């Protein structure tokens, strides 16, 4: 799997760094081009390997490349504190793109098509190598602003099958009951619209994106499925008030898994290795559970997202 990831990221990183060199610096061969690259903690070794290869390819140019740790989930917040001081190349999740574009923190790639040839690629190559949704999510007003890197930015349920049966994992009610009997918790991040939206999506509510990048929501009304936003919130409160539920800070699921506190959690592929280590032979994953809305069991929704 790591080898496949490397094949995907290598040309994209090379293209991004080549663009940064072209845009930020007009250096002679005896001058040093300074670049800063940010990526997730688990990608640091990979980034070091790829940046080393980049420097080998352009050995006639001197580079000073600094690699820093920055999660895709927090990249926007860090960048927007000081765009000029931010990294030249960084990874982020697709929902951050409108704000980054508005702040001038991303290049309009269409304006630098010729520069991409330094990395032996073209915009047509980038578009052809990725699914349409990933390209669309990185496009604003007809212009592409980022290189798609992954299409796995969604979430589901990890659970320890030695504690939680497949049947128990099917609903929040039975999931929490099984975890409580084992003296364990079920973790989920709720202080994030990206996660708590899953309850509303499951009940038939929607969100949309305005031309100015702001989000529209219909959660205050009645969904097409006949549920009200109040009904959904009551269902969420039933879950979160259960003693077996643990509200986990964004990005902290991995730490809670490693601590041994959890029998199950809502997360994505980025926590797969940690979940496997924590649950051992009991490691299992499945769709999100159903939850109670009024008198009905409603399938909790999820999202399909991209990373750049």
Label for each model-derived stretch:
Residues 10, 23-102, 286, 293-295:
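Conserved N-terminal structural module of periplasmic/extracytoplasmic solute-binding proteins
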Residues 68-78, 172-173, 245-258, 270:
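Short helix-initiation/N-cap motifs at beta->coil->alpha
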Residues 76-86, 103, 163, 177-181, ...:
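Short helices/loops that flank or line small-molecule/ion binding pockets
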Residues 94-155, 167:
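Hinge/lid segment of periplasmic solute-binding proteins
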Residues 136-150, 155, 174-220, 262:
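Extracytoplasmic/periplasmic solute-binding protein
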Residues 215-249:
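Glycine-centered hinge/linker elements that transmit conformational signals in sensory
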Residues 277-308:
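Extracytoplasmic/periplasmic substrate-recognition and gating elements
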């Amino acid at each position: 799997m790591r080898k496949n990831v490397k094949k995907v990221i290598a040309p994209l990183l090379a293209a991004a760094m080549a663009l940064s060199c072209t845009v930020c610096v007009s250096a002679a061969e005896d001058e040093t081009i300074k670049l800063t690259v940010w990526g997730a903690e688990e990608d640091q070794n990979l980034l070091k390997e790829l940046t080393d290869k980049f420097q080998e390819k352009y050995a006639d140019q001197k580079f000073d490349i600094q690699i820093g740790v920055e999660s895709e989930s927090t990249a926007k917040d860090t960048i927007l504190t000081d765009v000029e001081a931010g990294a030249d190349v960084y990874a982020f999740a697709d929902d951050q793109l409108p704000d980054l574009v508005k702040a001038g923190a991303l290049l309009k790639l269409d304006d630098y098509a010729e520069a991409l040839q330094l990395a032996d690629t073209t915009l047509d190559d980038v578009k052809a190598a990725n699914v349409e949704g990933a390209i669309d999510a990185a496009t604003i007003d007809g212009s592409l602003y980022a290189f798609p890197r992954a299409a796995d930015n969604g979430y589901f349920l990890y659970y320890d099958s030695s504690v939680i049966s497949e049947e128990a994992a099917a609903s929040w009610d039975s999931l929490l009951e099984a975890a409580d009997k084992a003296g364990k918790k079920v973790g989920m991040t709720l202080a994030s619209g990206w996660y708590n939206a899953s309850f509303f999506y499951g009940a038939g509510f929607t969100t949309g994106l305005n031309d100015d990048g702001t989000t529209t929501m219909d959660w205050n009304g009645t969904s097409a499925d006949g549920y009200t936003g109040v009904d959904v919130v009551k269902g969420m409160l039933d879950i979160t008030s259960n003693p077996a539920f643990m509200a986990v800070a964004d990005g902290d699921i991995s730490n809670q898994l490693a601590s041994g506190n959890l029998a199950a959690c809502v997360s994505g592929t980025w926590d797969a290795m940690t979940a496997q280590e924590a649950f051992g032979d009991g490691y299992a994953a499945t769709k999100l559970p159903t939850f109670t809305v009024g008198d009905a069991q409603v399938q909790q929704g999820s999202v399909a997202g991209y990373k750049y």
